[in-house]
């Protein structure tokens, strides 16, 4: 019987197998940010275990509320900052060098095919786009990971999504993952690995693959994963070129990280991307999906473009292509948050920031901020946002606010129209 890509990663990292199908895995990296990690840090300090298993494998960033908005968030940042200094963690990214973790860490080359990664953050699944096993964990598992460099997981069950066809105009990776979540539901992949394969996936950039894997958790998945290929190699080449004689040699190595043809899946689901329209959410669950055409005319107060889902350079290009030459509706507040300083700088160099500003957007520093209603774009009660983020739970971006999830291009069209824009807007 063949093995899936994640089963192969488990085999390569297993240090112990426990009763009940639990596997203790060696970790290649533990990622940390200032909201969840301080809880683990304080607990370890109280136990007299203020140390890390390997400082070179810890990557930490202050990203959720930066700069700090109040004493509480300042204290969270201080706990992480002081811990990083005490434990000689060199890869710590403070204000000025920081970005949204799930964009910054891949950009820095910290994610490699076949690696194992944990973080106290549910969207750690983003990094599966590189052919890694990456999962969000709770405080106890995070503490063990920091201290011992291991983490326990159940035997992985996988769902295979075979994506064929091509995107029509105005459709992007965000629409694809919204379509999938809409079909299987928020519990449709619970405790599963969502494995994305097929000709459409092969054609996607790393930015788009990260968007897909980022939202796997919204279907209940432990993680998402794509097979590494030459697109992966090209993205990582500045960081791996000393280890390989050529890109072809790197590809030959990474090409082993695919599922065998006779792998056993919990489910195999075929998706024709050609059938997908621009999509958005309604109500307060990410599986409540309607076409933008059906939702056309729904008034919005704010449009937010950014986050670990859609704050990368490709996303900014897609939105700017729609915005150029237009101004956003007078009643709309437009907020752009490039996910990292490098993305911000590249957007400046390409003239994208000017497009957003000319259209009427305010541009913030890289931060999670508005996505979880912590800063830089919190909604008032009764307000409605069009957002490129990943969650639309009740109160997610502010108590009593409504969030409609969508692609950056759809968000840009919505900002100009002043209401959720139907797909013909892209053809205008």
Question: What kind of region is each of these model predictions?
Answer:
Residues 1-428:
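Fe-S-dependent hydro-lyases/dehydratases of central metabolism
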């Amino acid at each position: 019987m063949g093995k899936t890509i994640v089963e192969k990663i488990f085999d390569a990292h297993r240090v112990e197998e426990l009763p009940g199908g639990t596997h203790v895995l060696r970790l290649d990296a533990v990622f940390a940010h200032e909201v969840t990690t301080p809880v683990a840090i304080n607990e370890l300090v109280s136990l007299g275990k203020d140390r890390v298993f390997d400082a070179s494998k810890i990557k930490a960033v202050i990203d959720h509320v930066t700069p700090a908005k109040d004493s509480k968030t300042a204290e969270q940042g201080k706990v992480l900052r002081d811990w990083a200094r005490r434990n000689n963690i060199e890869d710590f990214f403070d204000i000025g060098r920081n970005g949204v973790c799930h964009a910054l860490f891949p950009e820095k080359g910290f994610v490699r095919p076949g690696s194992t990664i944990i973080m106290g953050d549910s969207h750690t699944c983003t990094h599966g786009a590189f052919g890694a096993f990456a999962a969000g964990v709770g405080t106890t598992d995070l503490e063990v990971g920091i201290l011992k460099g291991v983490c326990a997981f159940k035997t992985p069950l996988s769902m295979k999504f075979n994506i064929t066809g091509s995107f029509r105009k105005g459709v992007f990776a965000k629409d694809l993952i919204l379509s999938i979540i809409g079909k299987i539901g928020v519990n449709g992949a619970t405790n599963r690995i969502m494995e994305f394969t097929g000709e459409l996936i092969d054609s996607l950039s790393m930015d788009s693959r990260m968007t897909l894997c980022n939202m796997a958790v919204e279907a209940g998945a432990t993680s998402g994963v794509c097979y590494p290929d030459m697109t992966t190699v090209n993205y990582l080449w500045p960081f791996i070129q000393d280890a390989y004689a050529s890109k072809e040699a790197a590809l030959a190595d990474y090409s082993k990280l695919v599922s065998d043809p006779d792998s056993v899946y919990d489910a195999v689901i075929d998706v024709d991307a050609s059938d997908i329209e621009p999509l958005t959410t309604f109500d307060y669950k990410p599986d409540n999906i309607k076409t933008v055409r059906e939702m056309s005319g729904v008034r919005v107060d704010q449009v937010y473009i950014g986050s670990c889902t859609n704050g990368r350079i490709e996303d900014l290009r897609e939105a700017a292509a729609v915005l150029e030459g237009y101004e956003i509706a007078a009643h709309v507040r437009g907020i752009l948050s490039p996910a990292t300083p490098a993305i911000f700088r590249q957007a400046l160099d390409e003239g994208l920031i000017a497009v957003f500003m000319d259209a009427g957007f305010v541009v913030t520093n890289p931060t999670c901020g508005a996505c979880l209603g912590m800063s830089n774009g919190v909604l008032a009660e009764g307000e409605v946002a069009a957002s490129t983020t990943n969650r639309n739970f009740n109160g997610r971006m502010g108590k009593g606010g409504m969030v409609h999830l969508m692609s950056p291009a759809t968000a840009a069209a919505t900002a100009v129209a002043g209401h959720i824009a139907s797909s013909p807007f892209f053809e205008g």
